[in-house]
Structures are given as C-alpha cells and as structure tokens.
Amino acid sequence: MPSCHLVIFFISFVCILLELFFTRILNFKAWNHIVYIIIPFAILGYGIGANFLLIFKEKIFRLKERMVVAVSLLALSAIILISTLLLIRFPLRVEYLVNLFANLSAISRLLQAYTLVMLPFVIIGFLVTYFFSLKPSESNKLYFFDLVGAGLGAAAFFFLINWLEVFRSLFLLSSLTLALSILFFICKNHRQIILGLLAIFVVCGALLPRLVPEIKEYAIDPAKGWEWIPGYYPKEDYDTLFSEWHPLGRTDIYRIKNPQIRQAIFDSSAGTFEINLDPPPEFSYFATNFLAGTPIYNMAPDGLQKYNSQVKLFSQGMEVPYTILREPKVVVIGTGGGRDIFMAKTHGAAGIVGAEINPAIFEQMSKGGRLHEYSGQIYTADNVKVFNIDGRHLVKTLQPNSYDLIILNGVDTFSGLSTGAYAYAESYLYTKNAVIDYLKLLSDDGMINFNRWLFADYPRETLKLHAICLQALREAGAQEPWKHIIIGGHKRWSINLIKKTPFTAEEKQAVKEYFKTHETELIFPTENWENNAAVETTNYYDQYAQAFIDGKENVFAHFYPFDISVITDDDPFFYKYYKLNFFNPFAVAVVHHTGTVIFMSQMLVL
C-alpha cells in the first residue's frame, strides 16, 4: 500500500481549497455574512464522516486498505464536481434567513444549500479519521502532513484563482482526486503516484483553460440590488466588457448604453456618482461580487466631446473640501473609477496619491487596461500615483504632516468582508486607530473627508463615525475635538469633514454657505447647540457631542438604540450597529449589507 502520508497531504490540500472556493461562490451569489456558514458546515461534515467510520469501524477495517482509500477518493472526486455545479445554480437568498422561523420552505432551501457545501467534507472527515485510526503510532507524522497540505493549499488558492478562476480550479481538484483514486489501483508505490499526479496536473493545467469554459452565469440573490446588472436590466441596454475572478471575488465591467438607465442609476446613487462635469458623460460600471461597485466615466477626449461635457467647478456637494483648501496634496483611499482623482485635479491638486485594493480594477484602469483610455488615463495622469494596496497600508508608508486632504468616499470593505478574512462587520478603514493615522498624515490645516450612508430616523454609521472621530481627535491632542468636525446631510449621504486644527469662523461660514446652495443640510454643529451647549435638541450628533464634553458619552451610547461604540483595530466592527436586544427572529431586519439578519447567520453557526 502506498504511503498514507501522501493521501493525508492531498486531502488537506483539497480541503482548504474547497473551503476557500466555496467561500468565493457563496459570496458572489449572496450577501457577505452568508459566507461565514461555510466553516461550521464543513466541520459538521468532518464530524459526520468521522462518526460514520466509528459506527461502522469493524466492517470498514475488514476491507482492503487500498480499496477503502480508492473508493473514498473516487466518491470525493464526484461530489466535488456535483456540489460545485449545484451550488452555482442553486438559489440562495437572504430571505431564507429572514423567514427561517416563519416558513418551512426557507428552512428546506437552507438545508439543501448547506448540504451541498457539507458533502465533500464528509468524505474528507472519513478519510482523515480512517488514517489516524489505522496508524495511531504515526499520528505525529500524519498531523505534520495534514498541516503542510492545508498550508500549501491556502497558498495555492491565490495562484489557482488567478490562473484558472473558480469552476476550472474546482474541476482541476476533482480531476486530480479522480487521478489519485485510479493511481491507487494501478501503482505499487507512492513515488509512482506522485509522478502520475504531477503529470496529470501539468496536462490538466495546459488543457483546462482551452477545453473547460469558466461558468459565468450564477443564480444570484436579487436582494443584492441593481448592481446585479444582468438581473436588473435588459441585455440590449448594456455590454459586458470584462469578467474575471481574483482573490477578492469576481469583478465585472458593464458599459451602460441606455441613457435612461444611466440617468436613473445616477439619480438613485447620489454621492457616489457625483462628478463636476455638465452634463455627465457616458459611464461604465465596475461591480465586484455585484456589491462593491464604482462608476467609470468616459473622460477620454471623444467621450467628453460626444456629450459636450464641460468641467463645472463647485457644482456638486462632494466638492465642499475645496471651498477651504487651495491646490491641496490629496490622498484618495478607494480610487475606484477615478472620479475623486478627476475632481481633485480640476481643483488644481498639487499631487494625488491613491490606493485601490481591488486588483482587477487597478489592472483595468492602469496603462494597458481596457479602461485606461476610456477613463481619460486618470490613473496615470500628471502628478497622480495609484497603488494596488490597502488604504491603511498606504497611509502608513507616506510622510507624516505632508498631505492636505484625505478622501474616503463611500469606501466599503465588502471585498475584504467577503473573503472570509473578516468576521461579519469589520472595517479597518474607520477605526479610531485609522483616524489617528490619517490625522498624523495631514498638514496643520488639512482635513479628512468621509462620505457615508445617512439613515433618516436614527443615525447609525455616521453617528458611530462621529463618535470615533471625537475620540481620535482627543487622543491626537485636540483640546476641543468638536470644533474640528462639520457634518452635512447630502441626499442619502453624509459629508463628514474632520480638520486637524479647529475650523475657523470663516471656514465654518464658507462650508455652511456651500451646504445651503448644494442640497445639503447642516447636521453638526447646529447653531442652537453652538450658541448654547446646554440646549436640549433632537439632533443626536449635538446630543452625543454634549455627552462627550460632559464625559458621559458611554452612558449615551449605552441607551442609544443602535451600537455607536468607538471601535479600534482590536475591535473593528464598524458595520455592527444593531444591538442584540433589537433582535426578533420573527421580524428580521435587512438593511443593505447589515441588519439583524446577521444574528440569524450567527445562530446557524452556533
């Protein structure tokens, strides 16, 4: 019998890759918090496989070792392919979680979906337990090969998803597992098996990209919204320019051809689409996992000429920082389609440095990419440098006290959330430590411009960000942090200006006047609160600031209906603003990517 160490290594290698690729599939199909079900259901599969062996141990150990392993690998090969194909086509929707206790069909759908996830891990759990039971004296060696296989599998994920994407990678794993099963029947030693596997890997690697098409059509949860462009708009109204998997998910580029649809998207998306061109030119759209999207305007000379688009300075609410700053040095975190770079350049920015974490966006916007010319070469324009790195990392590498404006315009970490690296609601861009890092980077008169979603009833993430900034300013040495902050409500967005030094009276007045003429309501500080800090008001931003001054901010946060606690890098749950006492399993809230529906995911994990 060939060495069992090879098999342990191989199935651990396959196991970690299955978990990672299934993570990618589920996040592409549904919301990011669905992803975190994979690990517990994989563990459930291990447990079922292990218990199956223990229950039928006597009968199984009467069989030939070679036969048990070969048949198990054959079954694993088939199940990998079947589970993958069914998981891609199977409808998995957030409404199943919402109706978990109210609808039997929802329970049935979830059970079916997670059974598909679990099945391959039943075989893996069976095989691992089989080898450890068969050779208990070699458990240390078996464990070593198990860890090495898992470690190399995790590293191989990045190579495979960039090379073969998702379905073809899983097809390769299924093929290699089938090959190993056959080799167990025909080979006499593990050296022959290794050579055979390597030969099959090379052959499959050469032929798969040509012979096996990558599946593009998935059953997507409609709750993802209009960013699922193929599901929301007729095919004749858009062109698919690009579609590619990478470690953060799948990025698609759509050119929106229908002017009415372009206008409808523009009107509904407010802040993220605002550009100081009149009229706005045609745009395409980057969608990563049909969530983390960004527009790319056709700012090539012919694109601007087609609609006679002209720069119109100070026509948009998001240009408010430039009422104070003149020819600033700018950092853009989340450069996306280059809109913030473009607006900074129109205001004479002395230099612009940007970070774009998504490798597909960075590649397509850079020289040689499909949208480099279309975007007006914005990523390679004069005095512009864009890096394919995380925003926090970029800030750490720049010279302190050397920039005047840091822009985070609706930057969300859906891509990071969806990898499974984060837990439900993390973001390291909005922690207290992050704000302190941003402040260190600024010149004395510099400012941070956060643009976040604005909730009409009880503010959530904007109020949470308000609390974070007040605390960060205090720890950075500000004597009166509330004098460093101005917040405006712009349509469904908040414009947050955080200045390193206090706003002067003239600067405040300039911002207030700009707000009045650009559909923006002054949220903080209101005149009533500024004139008499003891005045009670229904404005929660004023109330929190007053509690902060009085040293009672923790009391305010405790009684506030949503979680607005200050987060740090050690506790970075920015998107967690629902408290457990709000959770009613029979009336689950879904608010875009958040809501008490997250508690339903956690219940399934438990």
Task: Label each PLM-derived region with a short phrase.
Residues 1-318, 323-606:
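Alpha-helical transmembrane segments of multi-pass membrane proteins
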